[in-house]
From Swiss-Prot:
Entry coiled-coil feature ranges: none
Main localization (coarse): nucleus
UniProt organism field: Mycosarcoma maydis
SUPFAM superfamilies from the UniProt entry: L domain-like (SSF52058)
Assigned protein family: Belongs to the U2 small nuclear ribonucleoprotein A family.
Protein's cellular compartments: Nucleus
PANTHER family to which the protein is assigned, alphabetical: U2 SMALL NUCLEAR RIBONUCLEOPROTEIN A
Protein name stated in the entry: U2 small nuclear ribonucleoprotein A'
Protein's job: Involved in pre-mRNA splicing.
Positions of transmembrane segments: none
Gene Ontology CC entries for this record: post-mRNA release spliceosomal complex; U2 snRNP
LRR repeat ranges, renumbered to this chain: 19-40, 42-63, 64-85, 88-109
Length: 246
């Protein structure tokens, strides 16, 4: 079932036990996050548990949203711009999803207010240095998988992942290099819940090529510094497409 404006308009929104306004979208076989702009940023929490979502992204700017419940979905990728779209995100539940690469979690580092994170049941959570990597790369998180992060864990994570002069260790670098590889393989149709295959070649008479990791970083930096909404939209579209015109 697509997340249409009509579905959103008839979905229940109520005050939960934490006295937050929560939008209930549980168990609707939703394949992709879309059309949330029609909610007019009126919810503190959104419950999308038990759906078929594959990509954590495509959010409009939701400055009010603090809690996202996404357990039991199929999420394997995270939008690099999620911190820009959800600046107030405080609690994120990704239990029993399909995230396999620890490097994918780096995108959550831009969620400055994220303090509660759960990744239990994901392939990534079974990696040997999973907890140390998350603690090191997401220092704002205070509770991981329902366990409070202790100071000694932070110290161990830093020793394991960072050299004395502040550079990633060989272990950390090996994990992070997968981020560049995955960034080169963005599938736009995964973002919108479709199953089409990209065919390289020409678009509107222009040839295109994949963005390099350096070009993606430059675009992300340009988005961060831009003050024009139109420019941000254009840059984000290029980033999501993963291609540039030549």
């Amino acid at each position: 079932m697509k997340l249409t404006p009509e579905l959103l308009s008839r979905s229940s929104s109520s005050i939960n036990t934490l006295r937050d306004r929560e939008l209930d979208l549980r168990g609707l076989k939703i394949p992709a996050i879309e059309n949330l702009g029609v909610t007019r940023d009126q919810n503190d929490a959104i419950d999308l548990t038990d759906n078929d979502i594959r990509y954590l992204g495509n959010f409009p700017l939701l400055q009010q949203l603090k809690t996202l419940q996404l357990a039991n979905n199929l999420i394997s990728r995270i939008d690099p711009r999620i911190g820009h779209s959800l600046p107030a995100l405080h609690s994120l539940n990704l239990t029993n999803n399909c995230i396999s690469d620890l490097s994918e979690l780096v995108h959550l580092s831009k969620c400055r207010r994220l303090e509660y994170l759960c990744l239990m049941g994901t392939p990534a959570s079974r990696e040997a240095q999973y907890r140390e990597f998350v603690i090191w790369k997401l220092p704002q998180v205070r509770v991981l998988d329902y366990q409070r992060i202790k100071d000694k864990e932070r110290a161990r994570a830093k020793d394991l992942m960072e050299t004395e002069d502040g550079r990633p260790t060989a272990l950390a670098a090996n994990i992070l290099k997968k981020l560049g590889a995955s960034a080169m393989d963005v599938d736009v149709d995964v973002m919108v819940g479709k199953q089409k295959t990209f065919e390289p070649g020409r678009l509107n008479g222009s040839s295109r090529r994949l963005l390099t990791a350096e070009e993606r970083k430059a675009i992300e930096d340009a988005i961060e510094s831009s003050e024009s909404l139109e420019e941000i939209r254009k840059l984000e579209e290029q980033l999501k497409m993963g291609h540039t015109f030549v």
